[in-house]
């Protein structure tokens, strides 16, 4: 590959998909060999020879067209080894090169009659129907040989351009034209099938039609205007891309490289093959039969039937089941066409190009991790040892625990305490990325500090769930390990979950408690009517600090919803604040005791607060203590 080729491959502005012209389709498959021979046309439906198990010449796996099936070896075996590179064998005509060319070299099938492309005919919307301004039902009648279409009305007064005629109607008109007393000089001309469709599309002058439509749009309203706009959009797209409407009718169809539709020998001697080979074989068989019928000047009705069958075979190859009966193989299973391979979730784009499997990644079910901090996630040890294996191996060798990679891998398989200790050191400060599909906004992938956990599930902090739109009913998440230092820094600085509190779309908090957290908070702070409020000063239910309450609760001396008196010198929001206390007592030491509904405040002579006891539940103490403890640590 030259430097200029390298440049064009690696530096481009955009990729454009447009309709291919018949010549371009031929150019894809046609090649001139070093000896000047032009190859590329697939003319035989055979795949491989059942005796020699070698590809048949001019067939769907032909080595002359697609390249050798073995590296640096021609079909007949005359030339072997790399020293014969570029030579074309005089005996079999195969170029001596690498077998991997069979992954990108294409062929083509030259059709004996034009066929319509099913995507443009039966797609939604039907571009053929829109361009010709003919209902889709009528276009189908023409393409599948049910009706004639008038291509040139001639001198006939009753015929109009693009008018549909049944077989009987056309026979009557023919009798009228060829009658002895006929006055028609310019005979009308009709067509049927994809050839007629191609003629109609060739007759379109896009620029002129576009001008006429623009004039018509200014004077029209409602549904008619919408229809005209839809038509002009299609025409403008054709003009802008320099595509011709008649290219929607195929004169040749490309044959994709054989290694993308392989034929594999199974253990029992049988062969497994791609469905595409069966679909291509149907097309070639029908195409060859049609060519033979045309050569021997077979009756028109037989030729027409063969053309219709060729159209149906090409339809099945491009999009099986889009129109007519679905072509099935063994076990009554529908054959996978080119469209089936490309489209959908399991198609080439979404499965293989957009959704590639990447190294240093894993996937598992998520469960709630209530003891985690917001920037942490629980990573199963089994997954961590696999993801961080190169780092662990490096550290094991550096610490002289093992001498080589093989010994390190053996030690890792045992997963003993020594390995786990090294793994713990490796993941310390090494952020990982968690992604939940579908990633609809940038918070769908965030960074976390991993914490080693048992089991096989990833533990996630419940507060980050709204950002991922995740819940714990079986959702799965992917783990990715940033390798480069720049990637790790970026993950820590920009993507860490604790740095993404606000939604980038609205600016509102996206870290909000929901579901379990809300229910838990409610249950923790709920007041149960069946619990009696204790008298102030009761030793069993009066505590000197929040810590004492927590200890008593953990010791199972208190239940969660039990009323208690607890000393608390912090600020208290009380509904009674605007009113005066229920009762005020002057004590012997000149201090003053204010008795409120849910608290007792004691002040000295200078009105300074000495102590405050509040009446609350154990659950509310747990809630407050947890929040105060968390805030004080940050």
From Swiss-Prot:
<dbReference type="InterPro" id="IPR044893">
    <property type="entry name" value="RNA_pol_Rpb1_clamp_domain"/>
</dbReference>
<feature type="binding site">
    <location>
        <position position="76"/>
    </location>
    <ligand>
        <name>Zn(2+)</name>
    </ligand>
</feature>
<feature type="binding site">
    <location>
        <position position="475"/>
    </location>
    <ligand>
        <name>Mg(2+)</name>
    </ligand>
</feature>
<dbReference type="InterPro" id="IPR000722">
    <property type="entry name" value="RNA_pol_asu"/>
</dbReference>
<feature type="binding site">
    <location>
        <position position="74"/>
    </location>
    <ligand>
        <name>Zn(2+)</name>
    </ligand>
</feature>
<dbReference type="Pfam" id="PF00623">
    <property type="entry name" value="RNA_pol_Rpb1_2"/>
</dbReference>
<feature type="binding site">
    <location>
        <position position="89"/>
    </location>
    <ligand>
        <name>Zn(2+)</name>
    </ligand>
</feature>
<keyword id="KW-0804">Transcription</keyword>
<dbReference type="GO" id="GO:0003899">
    <property type="term" value="F:DNA-directed RNA polymerase activity"/>
</dbReference>
<protein>
    <recommendedName>
        <fullName>DNA-directed RNA polymerase subunit gamma</fullName>
        <ecNumber>2.7.7.6</ecNumber>
    </recommendedName>
</protein>
<dbReference type="InterPro" id="IPR042102">
    <property type="entry name" value="RNA_pol_Rpb1_3_sf"/>
</dbReference>
<keyword id="KW-0548">Nucleotidyltransferase</keyword>
<comment type="function">
    <text>DNA-dependent RNA polymerase catalyzes the transcription of DNA into RNA using the four ribonucleoside triphosphates as substrates.</text>
</comment>
<keyword id="KW-0862">Zinc</keyword>
<dbReference type="GO" id="GO:0008270">
    <property type="term" value="F:zinc ion binding"/>
</dbReference>
<comment type="subunit">
    <text>In cyanobacteria the RNAP catalytic core is composed of 2 alpha, 1 beta, 1 beta', 1 gamma and 1 omega subunit. When a sigma factor is associated with the core the holoenzyme is formed, which can initiate transcription.</text>
</comment>
<dbReference type="GO" id="GO:0000287">
    <property type="term" value="F:magnesium ion binding"/>
</dbReference>
<feature type="binding site">
    <location>
        <position position="92"/>
    </location>
    <ligand>
        <name>Zn(2+)</name>
    </ligand>
</feature>
<keyword id="KW-0479">Metal-binding</keyword>
<keyword id="KW-0808">Transferase</keyword>
<dbReference type="InterPro" id="IPR006592">
    <property type="entry name" value="RNA_pol_N"/>
</dbReference>
<dbReference type="InterPro" id="IPR012755">
    <property type="entry name" value="DNA-dir_RpoC1_gamma"/>
</dbReference>
<dbReference type="Pfam" id="PF04983">
    <property type="entry name" value="RNA_pol_Rpb1_3"/>
</dbReference>
<dbReference type="Pfam" id="PF04997">
    <property type="entry name" value="RNA_pol_Rpb1_1"/>
</dbReference>
<feature type="binding site">
    <location>
        <position position="473"/>
    </location>
    <ligand>
        <name>Mg(2+)</name>
    </ligand>
</feature>
<dbReference type="InterPro" id="IPR007080">
    <property type="entry name" value="RNA_pol_Rpb1_1"/>
</dbReference>
<feature type="binding site">
    <location>
        <position position="471"/>
    </location>
    <ligand>
        <name>Mg(2+)</name>
    </ligand>
</feature>
<dbReference type="InterPro" id="IPR034678">
    <property type="entry name" value="RNApol_RpoC1"/>
</dbReference>
<keyword id="KW-0240">DNA-directed RNA polymerase</keyword>
<comment type="similarity">
    <text>Belongs to the RNA polymerase beta' chain family. RpoC1 subfamily.</text>
</comment>
<dbReference type="GO" id="GO:0003677">
    <property type="term" value="F:DNA binding"/>
</dbReference>
<keyword id="KW-0460">Magnesium</keyword>
<dbReference type="InterPro" id="IPR007066">
    <property type="entry name" value="RNA_pol_Rpb1_3"/>
</dbReference>
<dbReference type="GO" id="GO:0006351">
    <property type="term" value="P:DNA-templated transcription"/>
</dbReference>
<dbReference type="GO" id="GO:0000428">
    <property type="term" value="C:DNA-directed RNA polymerase complex"/>
</dbReference>
<dbReference type="InterPro" id="IPR045867">
    <property type="entry name" value="DNA-dir_RpoC_beta_prime"/>
</dbReference>
